[in-house]
């Protein structure tokens, strides 16, 4: 029997899955790590952390499965969006931490680009806009703020490309990662844009010349890495791609109209389309399957699950506050109490902008806020307001997407850590009006990487590929009685950012003085 391995390098952990040809999970392993945040608005990671985690997770899977290494036919790596990419020298040695997707330090570069470049031309070529989220702005920060590093840089590699080189010795980049850089990638030609590289002052030689679709083979596994991983030398290593698109693939999205919200540290709500229009404020790049003809377009909140984690860590229930039997998990107790709070949190709103915001706001200086606080509000109200606030951000992106794509299926699939919460799934149904489905297997992007590996290795029938491996289960239906209330609150949510924008900017500028 033949098997494959899917890996997902995430922001806070790496996961590996060893999967059989029918999608059965044979082994799984994960390894956690932290993001370095040396200054407000900065977020970076050294790539060795990712590579060590990949080795550890895959080796743990192969050791647990005890298979003949020759039975494992392919490996595919999905990864977080690596922003700037990893600046490496000719020997592929990292010169500086990778400025990841949530890093917002390139605001001066954004301001300069907006003043000096033809933005309509940039949007038409790349299908994307200008914001410090995009990798090309972070590249310019490295060029201008770390000139010694820039002079030594031979390539700028996304996380999966760096790992793939360590495994195969080959330098390549997948189209989804290249397109997500924005600014320098021609989304129609599916190639680097020489005119935009020249206009922005980024040397084309820094971009890997070998562009592959996610399901194409980068190379065979080298003997050294093979021994560390418990795999056979020569095992096919696929190009892989961006995690949000991989999670969408895992969820069985294979046609326009279907849509998925991946809610982990951040939130990415996405769908498939044939063309991109940056005017709607969404991010677009070639999909991880059929990327020569299909685009993955998404909108997302920077700090979705991160807002929930932040609240739990800073304001969660202490042991003495637990109102039930001893031994109840404080997080579960908080969830239970929040479920008893009326929809709308008694007039309390939360703006989930803990590190600025991505689409469709696109403002690195936006700040998180509780609005409407009163003496009647307790921790349970605030916690529910956080869940609702992230969900309003989801709806905000869905409405922007509707302007671009039109009709959407009445079912929304949710993947990621948020899917563990029954309360949150119900809030999503009530706020968006969609039937909410989740994946029974709870494996997301790594499962998508494994599915892609199995397809590339010829292990799937057409029906298996069309329908995917996942088993979807219904989680929540919208409550019609709450529709008007949530529509009113969402309208108030939409008004908050424009009303507070100037104050957000004043506070941010005062902080940075």
For the regions a protein language model found, what residue spans apply to each?
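Glycine/GP-enriched mid-protein hinge/lid loop-to-helix segment characteristic of carbohydrate kinases
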Residues: 23, 96-122, 277
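A conserved helix-loop-beta module that forms one wall/lid of the active-site cleft
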Residues: 201-213
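Short beta-strand-loop/turn "lid" adjacent to the catalytic site in phosphate-handling enzymes
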Residues: 63-101, 129-133, 164-186, 210-215
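Pocket-flanking alpha-helical
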Residues: 87, 108-112, 247-249
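N-terminal glycine/serine-rich phosphate-binding loop of ATP-dependent small-molecule kinases
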Residues: 1-96, 124, 152, 226-227, ...
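Residue-level signal for inorganic ion chemistry
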Residues: 23, 46, 75, 103, ...
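Active-site core segments that coordinate phosphate-bearing ligands/cofactors
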Residues: 5-6, 114-128, 137-172, 183-199, ...
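Short, acidic/turn-prone active-site loops that include or flank metal/cofactor-
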Residues: 31, 99-106, 265-267, 440-444
